[in-house]
Amino acid sequence: MDSTVGDSKSKYDSAYKLFESEDYEAAAEILLTLLEDSFYGAYAYFVLGEISNITGDPLAAKDLYYKALEVKPDLYVNLLSPDHPNYDYVFTGMKYETPVEACPLCGKSGEPIWCYPTMRFKSLHLRNHNPVRVWMYCKDCHHIYAEEFPEQEVLESGTDLAYANMFKTNTSRFDHYSFVLSKLSGFTEGRELLEIGLGGCECVLVAVELGFDVFGVDIMDTGVALAKKYGIEAELQDFMSFETERKWDIIIFGDVIEHVSDPRKSIVKLYDLLKDDGVLWLSTPNFDSAFSVVNGHDDGMRLEVSHKNYFSRISLLDLLEQCGFVPVDYQLSPYFPGSMEVIAVKDVRGND
């Protein structure tokens, strides 16, 4: 082995050990000496990006992550295991994404809070996204949102492969949805149920068994096809464009709101689709959850590029109340660590 290469490897290994022990200043000092190295330079830029993100400079992290990919476009071949879905990713340049100019909840300006190289995420990655995600924080709403996002038509061109595993029925969730539907029945006697975002159809299947009149809406043809396979009526539609005079007793909105551009309009739409004595159940990741606080920078949801929003308990409950709902129940998700499940009823009950 060339002595120069061996020296570079020794330096990088030493720097990485310091990084792992959270001695970021000492690690950075060594990494800066490796930036011109023909092999380790790219990895030095990458780890410096990690350090910048962890120490509170997400915009510097963004520049460093991209510099690493520019120096070595196939960087991940030495960062990920061969069985990782993005092991063979090769950076070909930044794609245009639509800037999110302000907080989608209140319209005020946010500040960069995190930056992550998203190719490390193992599930639901869409390669139409840029490989680096900056998250913005709104202190007024205590809400986090994506700095930029691809156009919808670009997203749709990559969804079938990316979401394939999502549209498989997970029978282990049947018991939980039975519990949820029984709880919802305590807030309404009605039996008409609408689910928006069908996923693996676990909820609607259980609802049918329990005697509910079920209808589904999904933007993904895979979800609609699965519902129809099970004999469940469903429509392929962006629910924001879903027009009907029908009202429902129960609406299930599981893990959808983090994907929408305008959460406020979505909640208003749900309010309009519910009967006056109707009840809403929704779930979404919570960046303030006990799980997320403990995991910090290892929180996988920070890598989830298909999400436009990352709610907190405060931002979600405030939004519901501002749109005419009264939150009546809050639970931790038993299936998605760090996610919350909320039940809300229409505020008209308090005005009778």
State where each predicted segment sits.
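Conserved N-terminal segment of class I S-adenosyl-L-methionine
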Residues: 9, 16-19, 43, 74-254, ...
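S-adenosyl-L-methionine-dependent methyltransferase catalytic module, highlighting the catalytic core
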Residues: 98, 253, 260-352
